[in-house]
Amino acid sequence: MADDAADPKGNPIGTELVYEDDSVRVWRIELAPGETAGWHTHYLDYTTVVVEGDLVERPNADGSVDRIEVKPGAIMRWNQGTLRHALRNIGTKTFRNVIVEVKGRQTGA
């Protein structure tokens, strides 16, 4: 199931695909301090829920890098995009996040 849920280049969106039905796909991501999740692109609108962590860095394919302070309980909604990125835990705590991708939604809907 995870292979079908990967981005078109074969890279998974999270560490583990934990649920999928016709409406949503739910990922868990866990990164120890210093660990990096591979390059991927989100092709669906999605929402993230921070479970644990403090600071992550998102290197983008265009060369830019975003530093993001995260707090447990924070919820962020993102539109699908075409910018490939990775995610690196540059904090002191394990980063744990839940990603909920919404199937069949158009960006901005």
Annotate each predicted stretch with a short phrase.
Residues 10-39, 45-48, 99-100:
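A short glycine-rich, His/Asp/Glu-containing loop-to-beta-strand
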Residues 43-62:
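Glycine- and acidic-residue-biased ligand/ion/polar-headgroup-sensing regions
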Residues 1-13, 105-109:
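Basic/polar N-terminal segments that are highly enriched at the extreme N-terminus
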Residues 62-81:
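Short acidic-glycine-tyrosine-enriched beta hairpin
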